[in-house]
Regions:
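Transmembrane alpha-helical core positions of polytopic small-molecule transporters
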Residues: 96-100, 125, 156
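Structured helix-beta-strand junction loops
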Residues: 48, 116-117, 143
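Residue-level detector of anion-binding/catalytic polar loops
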Residues: 119-120, 198
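Asp-based, Mg2+/Mn2+-dependent phosphohydrolase catalytic module
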Residues: 1-7, 20, 108, 112, ...
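N-terminal helical cap/lid subdomain that shapes the substrate entry/recognition surface
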Residues: 2-105
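A short, Lys/Arg-enriched amphipathic alpha-helix followed by its capping loop at the start of a domain
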Residues: 28-32, 110-117
């Protein structure tokens, strides 16, 4: 039996390449509105967006407000006149974002291996419609025992409520065997800590942790994650077990 029998997973930049999706959707949308869409514009948007999502994680803003003000703040930061189309720009950006579901290298193999030994579930703060489309398009849904999006649940990471809903729905009672894996310290790791489960910071870029948030584990690859989740005998059987989802993959 695995060391961790339930693994909760973030989506963006943990399983799917959100940075690439964000950049493409953003530049396409800005081009449609005949606005600057160069590297500088992308960097400004990323900073504005990061600040807003951090405010959401701290309980200072809800998601509806975030989506309403995001591109108005961007226009202001770019020193561009407010065109009054911030909400329409956001809607178009989200629509374009939903069409991008690029997997990070090795993600499907990792899910295939982990799903052999543990209950897997997604816990995400993304927009429900966008994430649902990206999850289905990427094929990661077939490995999941549950998918929990904050917009549907009514609570966002790092609130323990989202995690508690997921664990209750999954029938998980022993939190000592639960591991939360994600790339965002404030949302994923702090959220897991708030929920009383062990945490693993997925940090393939070796970003410095400048916060006081302390994950139990830090990994730079899925292979390192295997060694945290699996018992030694399970590690020896990587790639050779009967596939729990093999028939589904052929449908």
């Amino acid at each position: 039996m695995a060391i961790y029998t339930c693994v909760l997973l973030d989506i963006d930049n943990t399983l799917l390449d959100f940075d690439a999706a964000e950049r493409q959707a953003l530049t396409d949308m800005l081009a449609e509105y005949e606005l600057p869409h160069d590297e500088h514009a992308c960097a400004v948007y990323h900073q504005v967006n990061r600040e807003l999502w951090d405010a959401l994680a701290k309980g200072q803003m809800n998601k509806q407000k975030l989506f309403q003000v995001r591109f108005g703040r961007f226009m202001q930061a770019m020193q561009l006149p407010d065109n009054g189309k911030g909400k329409a720009m956001n809607d178009r950006y989200e629509e374009l974002l939903s069409t991008h579901a690029d997997l990070l290298p090795g993600a499907l193999t990792a899910l295939e291996e982990l799903s052999e030994v543990a209950t897997l579930a997604i816990v995400s703060n993304g927009a429900a419609a966008v994430q649902a489309h990206r999850i289905a398009a990427s094929g990661i849904d077939r490995y999941m025992d549950g998918i929990y999006i904050s917009e549907k649940i009514g609570a966002a990471k790092p609130s323990a409520k989202l995690f508690e809903h997921a664990l209750r729905d999954l029938g998980i009672t022993n939190r000592s065997r639960v591991l939360m894996v994600g790339d965002d310290l404030l949302a994923d790791i702090k959220g897991g800590i708030n929920a009383g489960v062990d945490t693993c910071w997925y940090n393939p870029r070796n970003v410095e942790n400048k916060t006081d948030i302390a994950p139990k584990f830090t990994v730079g690859s899925y292979e390192e994650l295997y060694r945290i989740v699996m018992e030694p005998e399970e590690l020896e059987n990587l790639g050779v077990r009967n596939r729990r989802h093999s028939n589904e993959a052929l449908l």
